[in-house]
Amino acid sequence: MNKALFLSLVVLCAAVVFAAEDLQKAKHAPFKLAAPCFCSGKPGRGDLWIFRGTCPGGYGYTSNCYKWPNICCYPH
């Protein structure tokens, strides 16, 4: 009985360690809250940011067009 309890505790501890490691990776994963959009006269697809007046920093956006009250931001 003691060996089974010890083995159960070891498995439980290992599961906690692996779950915590996955959470650390998830914190640093890139995540955008944008939908695809298209602007006339611009090739490709942009990112539609809802209820924003400007494009957010840190994503490499270089141009945009307004689709009131939203903005469509282009990375190239």
UniProtKB/Swiss-Prot annotation:
Blocks Kv3 voltage-gated potassium channels. Reduces blood pressure. Disulfide bonds join 37-72, 39-65, 55-73. Residues 1-19 form the signal peptide. It comes from Anemonia viridis. It holds the Pfam family Defensin_4. Belongs to the sea anemone type 3 (BDS) potassium channel toxin family. One of its GO terms (molecular function) is ion channel inhibitor activity. InterPro entries: BDS_K_chnl_tox (IPR012414), Myo_ane_neurotoxin_sf (IPR023355). Keywords: Disulfide bond, Hypotensive agent, Ion channel impairing toxin, Nematocyst, Potassium channel impairing toxin, Secreted, Signal, Toxin, Voltage-gated potassium channel impairing toxin. This is Kappa-actitoxin-Avd4o. The keyword Disulfide bond applies. Experimental results show no expression in the ectodermal tissue from the distal and proximal tentacles, body wall, and oral disk. Since paralogs are expressed in this tissue, an expression of this toxin in this tissue is probable. The negative results could be explained by the very low abundance of EST sequences. Residues 20-33 form a propeptide. Its main location: secreted. It is found in: Secreted; Nematocyst.
